[in-house]
Amino acid sequence: MFMINLFSLIIPILLAVAFLTLVERKTLGYMQLRKGPNVVGPYGLLQPFADAIKLFTKEPLRPLTSSKFMFTIAPALALTLALTMWVPLPMPYPLINMNLSMLFILAMSSLAVYSILWSGWASNSKYALIGALRAVAQTISYEVSLAIILLPTMLMNGSFTLSTLTTTQEHLWLIFPLWPLAMMWFVSTLAETNRAPFDLTEGESELVSGFNVEYAAGPFALFFMTEYANIIMMNALTAILFLGTFHNPLLPEAHTINLILKTSLLTICFLWVRASYPRFRYDQLMHLLWKNFLPLTLALCMWHMSIPIMLACIPPQT
């Protein structure tokens, strides 16, 4: 039974990832005054399946001097961790209801750094290694701001459980009292998922393709799916944290539809940002976090922690 639950979680995620690639290409196409994919199937709807067949039927080549075990295991580990992060998300009920689901998601996203580092190092290519080091530095740096932003949010929630956020936001979405943190959270999720304008790991003009430069066929497709699964997961998390999802115990489907709509809108914002802004310079990226976001988030964190003490009130105890 558990395996059925697991597959019923994984298969829709992979389908969503497939169609997100199509939505991205269509969005970028229309923003650049062209059509995007429109040959395979009606309006190009079968393009993701054509891409999948092409990638998974090609021969996966491996550089002669690469580390065979790490080179092979890195993409599989990346996708496994990306899918594991979905387990505690309430939609409206999580697959496994954890007391510390938010910490679990942070821990899993930290572990994802290893797959990037292994893939870059095992490729035995200078471009892949530089791309991997950049990706690791960027991911670790922005996780600091994500964790600090989560503290006041969880303080208002009263626990680290994601399921209780629905109850907390019944009357007021947390985006209103926490709007500066919500804005910084959105930018940090862009950086965390290595998306434009923070996609320095795959600077085509300098690093060819970043840490996955030596990958082809199936393993490359796994990295590609990981990136898009992480994007959808981060946006679903943003919707749960700040855009309280409507929940009626008699109609649990309404919660799921609500969450899907909000996640889709946030994902389209990700694509919109990609189409609109140029890439940051590496030092600007680091300065944004360590000199702007970190002092701001720390100050706001102390402010939000002092409010309950000052007003002698307690967060919701659920």
UniProtKB/Swiss-Prot annotation:
InterPro entries: NADH_UbQ_OxRdtase_su1/FPO, NADH_UbQ_OxRdtase_su1_CS. The chain crosses the membrane at residues 2-22, 69-89, 102-122, 146-166, 171-191, 231-251, 253-273, 294-314. GO terms for cellular component: mitochondrial inner membrane. Core subunit of respiratory chain NADH dehydrogenase (Complex I) which is composed of 45 different subunits. The lineage of its organism: Eukaryota, Metazoa, Chordata, Craniata, Vertebrata. Core subunit of the mitochondrial membrane respiratory chain NADH dehydrogenase (Complex I) which catalyzes electron transfer from NADH through the respiratory chain, using ubiquinone as an electron acceptor. Essential for the catalytic activity and assembly of complex I. This is NADH-ubiquinone oxidoreductase chain 1. It is an enzyme of class 7 (translocase). It is a multi-pass membrane protein. Its main location: mitochondrion. Its EC number is 7.1.1.2. Belongs to the complex I subunit 1 family. It comes from Dugong dugon (Dugong). HAMAP family: NDH1_NuoH. One of its GO terms (molecular function) is NADH dehydrogenase (ubiquinone) activity.
